[in-house]
From Swiss-Prot:
Residues 7-41, 80-115 form the EF-hand domain. It comes from the Eukaryota. GO terms for molecular function: calcium ion binding. The gene is Mlc1. Keywords: Motor protein, Muscle protein, Myosin, Repeat. InterPro entries: CALM/Myosin/TropC-like (IPR050230), EF-hand-dom_pair (IPR011992), EF_hand_dom (IPR002048). The keyword Metal-binding does not apply. This is Myosin light chain alkali. It comes from Drosophila simulans (Fruit fly). GO terms for cellular component: muscle myosin complex. Myosin is a hexamer of 2 heavy chains and 4 light chains. GO terms for biological process: mesoderm development.
Length: 155
């Protein structure tokens, strides 16, 4: 099965169970979310290249089609890692004390690179952000740690 270890196949099956319809697979618009739920960080360009779509109900991806995609993304070198994100955010750390302005982080997420929309940023901040201090600064390393931590599975 696309050189994916049994335990990882079980994780993929669980994601398909949660995100898809039995026997039909997942909607191709959810390809990126499925990969991220499996602790991968594919770019939007890679998701599109691998068959992700922008509109719902255009295409379904079955488990046997997804496993080679999962395997390929696991091997992909263009995924951000913790150190990459920290190096990027250090550019905003003018005092070199591990903090940056919340407004600058929000601007970066909304306007730079593969930008997010307002709702995505609000969700991200609610899930991963420490409160800003009186001057509007936040500790960015904890933010990145939470952002990249394994997803919590609720029973």
């Amino acid at each position: 099965m696309a050189d994916v270890p049994k335990r990882e196949v079980e994780n993929v099956e669980f994601v398909f169970e949660v995100m898809g319809s039995p026997g039909e697979g997942i909607d191709a618009v959810d390809l990126g979310d499925a990969l991220r739920a499996l602790n991968l960080n594919p770019t939007l360009a890679l998701i599109e290249k691998l068959g992700g779509t922008k509109k719902r109900n255009e295409k379904k991806i079955k488990l046997d089609e997804f496993l080679p995609i999962y395997s390929q993304v696991k091997k992909e070198k263009e995924q951000g890692c913790y150190e990459d994100f920290i190096e990027c955010l250090k550019l905003y750390d003018k005092e070199e004390n591990g903090t940056m302005m919340l407004a600058e982080l929000q601007h970066a997420l909304l306007a730079l690179g593969e930008s997010l929309d307002d709702e995505q940023v609000e969700t991200l901040f609610a899930d991963c952000m420490d409160p800003e201090d009186d001057e509007g600064f936040i500790p960015y390393s904890q933010f990145v740690q939470r952002l990249m931590s394994d997803p919590v599975v609720f029973d």
